[in-house]
A protein has these predicted regions:
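C-terminal outer-membrane beta-barrel translocator/porin domains of Gram-negative envelope proteins
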Residues: 270-402, 406-409, 413-414, 455-456
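Periplasmic polypeptide-binding modules associated with outer-membrane biogenesis and secretion
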Residues: 1-161, 189-198, 327, 347-349
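Outer-membrane beta-barrel proteins
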Residues: 176-180, 202-209, 247-253, 289-299, ...
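Outer-membrane beta-barrel translocator/channel fold
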Residues: 219-249, 253, 267-274, 444-461
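Transmembrane beta-strand segments that form the barrel wall of outer-membrane beta-barrel proteins
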Residues: 151-161, 172-178, 182-194, 199-201, ...
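Outer-membrane beta-barrel "beta-signal"
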Residues: 174, 430-434, 439, 444, ...
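Residues that define the transmembrane beta-barrel architecture of outer-membrane proteins
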Residues: 137, 166-170, 195-199, 238-242, ...
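Repeated loop/turn-to-beta-strand initiation elements of outer-membrane beta-barrel proteins
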Residues: 126, 151-153, 180-186, 209-215, ...
């Protein structure tokens, strides 16, 4: 048996495949089986644009020629998945995700794997269409690109602020999802309340087409105590935070993504009274190694994040320094049970691993913005702790509107300035999305404890969030 030249199969592989038929009298049935043996090799290697065929020929001296038709890559084009809408992502960013070299036979299995990996690690979605090439013996590929809106502008308001600096907040955010066309993301956020002003900005640039990213973040905030025991002391503070983070996907399938990341950060903060007396001046440097897991299934979503953090605290006010280590974790599980019913579980935890004194901002807090609704933000704290939220939901439509009931609980352990070590609450809430650009939610929480330390807790607490997105 003689074979035409192949880019994929070696002479040894092809001869081994037809070995059972060599030296025998073959009929049409055996010829079909012989071709199938060769085509099976192509499929095992992941090549679907290749095929062994028999061309019309005259058999001479018992030698049969099998023609190996291998669809070499011809034209590769990019098109928008939405008719009439242009995509903004640079073609080079998309094409470098695939091994589609002109004149080379492309591996379908590898291309499918690259497609899945790209779609799971990017905010744009691709699909690939194959067709017979314009040139004989070639296969043309058309890649369809579906992008989210290139930029979003958001106005928001909520009741998640601190009582001491203003519970009710407003803000604005701007996101450019592909600033230079490489899916490099720029985000700017401004938040204000009665006694606080803060700004946050980040720029994230991909290092390849498969989710490896470098993100630089900066934030600055000023705060003034406008309520509480310290109001008359003209307490003001300001802080800065700078971080650099590297993300890299470690394992990606169509339903799962495991990402590892490293982060270096530095935070400085200073608090003063009467504009002259500095009561706190600290700097915290930290190194973080973490893992993020995303798992998707129809009706179910699981997200988990675990971190190991090493920190160095410098207190300039009292000329003290310390080094400490901790583990933190977060998990959310959302499950759509049947029809419109579902539930969500959220949990967070921290474990102090040892070292010196920990910065107050790194303690584990319990309160409305930290796991247990119905109380003021950061009501109590300690070095160690955990909280859990259980929510039962009824979905009103497919746009995000729902009603829900919840149970929150949290507990602290380790070093703490507070006598109380646990908080809990129940409540009800609703989310409403009347139009695509407007989303709102509200909750009424009923705390189990009416007195925490010297603070009296209201019977019920109302919270809201309103987002308008363009």
């Amino acid at each position: 048996v003689h074979f035409t030249p192949s880019q994929i199969l070696t002479d040894k592989e092809t001869l081994e495949a037809v070995k059972p038929f060599v030296g025998t009298v073959v009929t049409g049935k055996e010829l079909t089986a012989m071709l199938e043996a060769v085509n099976r090799l192509y499929r095992q290697k992941g090549y679907v644009v290749c095929q062994a065929v028999l061309q019309p020929q005259r058999i001479s001296k018992g030698v049969l020629t099998i023609t190996l038709v291998e669809g070499k890559t011809g034209a590769v084009s990019l098109s928008s998945a939405v008719e009439g809408k242009e995509f903004k992502t640079r073609g080079g960013y998309i094409l470098r995700a695939f091994d589609l070299e002109k004149g080379k036979v492309s591996n379908y299995r590898e291309m499918l794997g690259d497609l899945v990996k790209f779609n799971m690690t990017n905010d744009i979605q691709l699909s690939v269409d194959m067709r017979a090439g314009q040139e004989p013996g070639t296969t043309d590929y058309e890649i369809f690109v579906q992008e989210p809106d290139p930029r979003t502008f958001t106005l928001f308001s909520d009741s998640s602020g601190s009582k001491s600096s203003g519970r009710y907040r407003g803000g604005v955010s701007f996101t450019e999802r592909s600033l230079l066309g490489w899916r490099d993301r720029l985000q700017l956020i401004g938040v204000f309340s009665h006694g606080s002003r803060s700004f946050m900005g980040s720029y994230s640039v991909p290092l390849n087409s498969f989710g490896t990213r470098l993100t630089a973040s900066y934030s600055y905030g000023r705060v003034k105590v406008v309520d509480g025991p310290s109001e008359d002391f003209d307490v003001k503070g300001h802080s800065q935070y700078l971080s650099l983070r590297l993300d890299h996907p470690l394992y990606v399938t169509s339903t799962s993504k495991l990402t590892g990341y490293l982060q270096a950060a530095r935070q400085t903060s200073e608090t003063e009274m009467f504009n002259v007396l500095t009561v706190s001046d600290t700097s915290v440097k930290s190194l973080t190694a973490g893992l993020e897991q995303l798992w998707l299934k129809e009706g179910m979503t699981l997200y988990a994040n675990g971190q190991y953090i090493e920190s160095w605290l410098k207190d300039y006010t009292f000329d003290n320094a310390s080094r400490y280590r901790r583990l933190t974790g977060y998990l959310t599980w959302d499950h759509r049970l049947w029809k419109n019913w579902g539930y969500t579980v959220n949990a967070g935890a921290q474990r102090y691993l040892g070292g010196g004194e920990m910065a107050s901002g790194d303690s584990f807090y319990l309160g409305t913005s930290s796991g247990v609704r119905g109380y003021e933000n950061d009501t109590i704290s300690a070095y160690n702790g955990a909280w859990i939220n259980l929510e039962a939901k009824y979905h009103l439509d497919g746009k995000g509107s729902n009603v829900f009931a919840f149970l929150d609980a949290g507990r602290l352990s380790g070093d703490s300035p507070y006598k109380d070590k646990s908080l809990g609450s129940v409540g009800i809430g609703a989310s409403w999305r009347p139009v695509d650009w407007l989303m709102s939610s509200a909750t009424i929480s009923f705390p189990f404890k009416r007195n925490v330390g010297s603070e009296h807790v209201s019977k019920a607490r109302f919270d809201f969030v309103i987002n308008a997105v363009w």
